[in-house]
Amino acid sequence: MSYQRVEIPESDIQRQLDICAQLRAHFSAGGRQPLAMVDTYGCQQNEADSEKLRGYLRAMGFDFTQDEFAADVVVMNTCAVREHAETRVFGNVGALTHTKARNPEQIIAVCGCMAQQEHVAEKLKKSYRIVDLVFGPHELWRFPELLRSVCTEHRRVFAIDPADGSVAEGIPQQRDGSVKAWLSIMYGCNNFCTYCIVPYVRGRERSRHPEEIVREARELVAAGYKDITLLGQNVDSYGRDLDEDVDFADLIRSINAIPGDFVIRFMSSHPKDATEKLFRAMAECEKCAHQMHLPVQSGNDRVLHAMNRGYTREKYLAQVALARQYMPDLVLTTDIIVGFPGETDAEFQDTLSLVVTVPGVMMRMMSRSTSPLASAGSSSCSQMATL
């Protein structure tokens, strides 16, 4: 699959900020404080995206509320990884019918990974007439422009860019807390695990330039943040799409060199891409937490191959052993999928035995959800292993 990296020009982001100023005048015309509600579903990357949505809304003059009846603008930032999250979103969107009836001027927006799917956008268009704005992750940087179209043209707006995505710097952020901070270092994924929808909705991997990341980290430390989590679907792939000679271990060392009292964390790593260089950097950088999320998904080689994970059971165990050589106190967490299509009881027992083999690992276990975009989504799970 061909891919061309797209970086949004600074002038385009400035244009969005200029639109924010226009919308500030629009929403304050009634003489009262406008209120917005941003409801976030799913992963930490979605939480980081919601901080940008709130940053834009703050630039438009909004304060924030958790009362949907009081909100002038409601934004649902959605997740498409698991079926349960989609069901919740549709239920909650439907419940907003009552708020829209009470306040017909209320603007309802649905964005995020779920909105990027064509069948979801079509369902929202046909069956949820109360929704005014739908846009995917690739269009987040254009949120002010899209919202202005709803306000001034009095029409529903659907902006689903099928491109692989872009990198946009300079979007304002309204962070959730004052101690812990998310710091996105890259977007998208190139792995195409057969159970996963992320590459289809988030696009291919795009790394931010290291100087932009270090600049943001410095600003966070200066603002008093003590716990900085570096975010990427696969942080171990960081830098591969850049012209610069930099990888994730180099980035950790650069952030570690920032003066101040703070902790560096990151998520998530991929067993096929984590390197000894990374483990060494984690061990040698005093600000880097000895903590790693290393999803195994299965302990059986045939199932791992069917998942397109790119490693074997033996490779995973070797990675864990090497990491613990450098960091005996390593806190390891992992993900396990139970009931992957075609998984037998014997193959499931291989996963159980791996759990016993890796002492001290903390696990998240889930039953697989179907997805119309992931290639395993059309398979039926006739054999469901049980714990």
What residue ranges belong to the model's regions?
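Proteins enriched for Cys/Gly/acidic motifs involved in redox and nucleic-acid/cofactor modification
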Residues: M1-Y238, K277, M292, E314-L322, ...
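Low-acidity, Ser/Thr- and Arg-rich intrinsically disordered low-complexity segments
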Residues: S367-S371, S375-S382, T386
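Structured C-terminal cores of nucleic-acid metabolism proteins
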Residues: T344-R364, R368, L387
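Conserved SAM/AdoMet-binding glycine-rich loop
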Residues: I108-V110, Q117-H119, A222-F348
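Proline-centered flexible-loop/turn and helix-kink motifs
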Residues: A101-P104, R129-I130, G260, E286, ...
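Detector for intrinsically disordered, low-structure N-terminal pre-sequences
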Residues: D72, R156, D245, I337, ...
